[in-house]
Amino acid sequence: MGNAELQIIVLAADAGPPDAPPWQSALVNGVPLLPLMLGRATAVAGHAVSVVLGAHAALLAPALGRLPVTLVVDRHWQEGPAAPVRAGIQSLAGSCSGALLLHASQSGVTSAELQRLVDVWRRDTRAMVAAPCNAGHDLPAIFPRSEFPGLLALRGEQGPQRLLRRPGIRVVSVP
């Protein structure tokens, strides 16, 4: 199933600290964080990248005009981490076989690391593929279409890691 359609969803909806500039605009080696992460995502997936904005959408969206990404505005971002995940999944085309979820704050994640996740997933598009962490698995992670209902069922403070950390679930680890 090498031709399975994968979409990268970059999560950037939360507000960050009150009375502070948007964290998405923080500079990493002189480059604003959000465009940096979107550049890494598009290097792997081309135009198959969506970004979910929320709290600072009006401020951040104009800076994304030239990037080949789909903008999703989550009007329910204040609910917690679950809302932008749902907004991103709801925006996907029916032909989408899987979604790679990446939080925009993960500036340590490179395009090469994202590509490794994708390469492993393409060998078995029914598998969840994720980065290992102390608590089990974390983002970035690829969720096959069969996991979309679980992502859409998340509420409030529940993040997608909840699906990765279910007892007995098989997740392929890609360090």
Question: Where do the protein language model's features map onto the residues?
Answer:
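N-terminal glycine-rich phosphate-binding loop and ensuing alpha1 helix
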Residues: 2-58
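Conserved alpha/beta core of the MobA/IspD/sugar-nucleotide pyrophosphorylase nucleotidyltransferase superfamily
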Residues: 2-9, 153-175
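Residues at secondary-structure transition points
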Residues: 20-23, 28-32, 55, 72-83, ...
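Conserved beta-loop-beta/alpha segment of the NTase-like Rossmann-fold superfamily
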Residues: 77-145, 149
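Conserved beta-strand scaffold positions in the cores of enzyme catalytic domains, especially
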Residues: 25, 71, 128-130, 169-173
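Short beta-strand segments
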Residues: 9-13, 102-103, 131-134, 174-175
